[in-house]
Amino acid sequence: SEEYLGAALEGRRDSFILATKSMARDYAGMSQDVEISLSNLRTNYIDLYQLHNLPEKDFELAFGGGGAYRALSEAKAAGKIGHIGVTAHSLDALKRLVEEYGDRIETVMFPYNIVELQGREVLALARQKGIGTIAMKPLAGGNLEDWRLALRFIAASEVCDISIPGMGSPEEVERNAAVAEELSPLTKEELE
């Protein structure tokens, strides 16, 4: 998808915030992935680069001296990336990331939606620590019929700074953008 985005955004890079991710856990792999992403995206700068789906068993490797975090820190110092984030699918991993590595990461991304609320307290803690929070799967992987209500729920949640609904067609892009433009608070009845 990076190659498609690179082609679509060519000449308009400054109008967008670019985020991407890598499964690399070691220094060499992450260094290589950053360079590949820059090339694929046809840019010299990525706004947010994320360690993707980081399980607890990989924390020591990723954040150790020879790990992916060092490569991202160097890329940030060189002006190749703006911010360093992590994504997680396990609540225990998210909690540890925020508590133990919160001074190193600038964003966390975790599944959060109207039916998956387990991350609420940890996302709130992340925000208290100044870590940006991103709602992954705000439409529960496409399983929610009332997408407008689902996106309004995220906007009213007070624990997510942004949500990234998956979109597979221009119509879905327009639909989700319309919710943002017409955003209204949830009523008491809707919250219940």
Where are the regions a protein language model picked out?
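N-terminal binding-site loop/beta-alpha segment at the start of enzyme catalytic domains
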Residues: 1-16
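Hydrophobic packing residues within well-ordered alpha-helices of enzyme cores
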Residues: 5-8, 94-97, 173-176
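Active-site catalytic pocket residues across diverse enzymes, especially alpha/beta-hydrolases
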Residues: 9, 101, 180
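Acidic-histidine catalytic/liganding microenvironments
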Residues: 12, 78, 157
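Hydrophobic/aromatic residues located in beta-strands of well-ordered beta-sheets
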Residues: 16-18, 84, 133, 163
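Glycine/proline-rich, positively charged
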Residues: 25-121, 127-134
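Structured C-terminal cap/extension of enzyme domains
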Residues: 104, 120-192
